[in-house]
């Protein structure tokens, strides 16, 4: 029988979503996706149905240039540096670490592509810090493993001589 007895422009609904299969210009309640029960309308004409939870659903039904938001953070994948992480969106220095300090693996130095972490919180990035786990030391000029800061822990008494680091006799 006629599934749309009160609508003379429709009579069949193959996918059972309640929208008719007839696509003619005069048809009302027509289904833009007659073979897909999860989709029926495409407002922006991008080929992705307006139901975001349907098959290849459009999370941005009024923007024909955007449709997918994999992490459901409200930012289209094309505009999201981290399309699979809802806690991060932007990476201004393109180092692979997100700029949101409260997000997953945040970039402590969002404007420096060579730094992203500061484990000891001494304001010197781990890559430039000779002692990334000791906030009292950052540099080791002679490379002997003892820090140059004379007031820091394990201080090098001879920061320019790699063969000496301690002065036990004062």
Identify the residue ranges that each predicted region occupies.
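Extracellular calcium-associated, cysteine-rich motifs in secreted modular proteins
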Residues: 1-170
